[in-house]
Amino acid sequence: MYHYYSPDALRTXN
């Protein structure tokens, strides 16, 4: 999986 900043990624808490 690629590590890119996204509104969805922040939702997971990164």
Swiss-Prot record:
Record field: catalytic activity: RX + glutathione = an S-substituted glutathione + a halide anion + H(+)
Lineage: Bacteria, Pseudomonadati, Pseudomonadota, Gammaproteobacteria, Pseudomonadales
Protein name: Glutathione S-transferase
Family indicated by similarity: Belongs to the GST superfamily.
Spans traversing the lipid bilayer: none
Record note on quaternary structure: Monomer and homodimer.
Function: Conjugation of reduced glutathione to a wide number of exogenous and endogenous hydrophobic electrophiles.
Provenance organism: Pseudomonas putida
Keyword Transferase attached: yes
An annotated GO cellular component: cytoplasm
EC number: 2.5.1.18
Signal sequence annotation: none
Keywords linked to the UniProt accession: Cytoplasm, Transferase
Protein location: Cytoplasm
Keyword Cytoplasm among record annotations: yes
One Gene Ontology molecular-function label: glutathione transferase activity
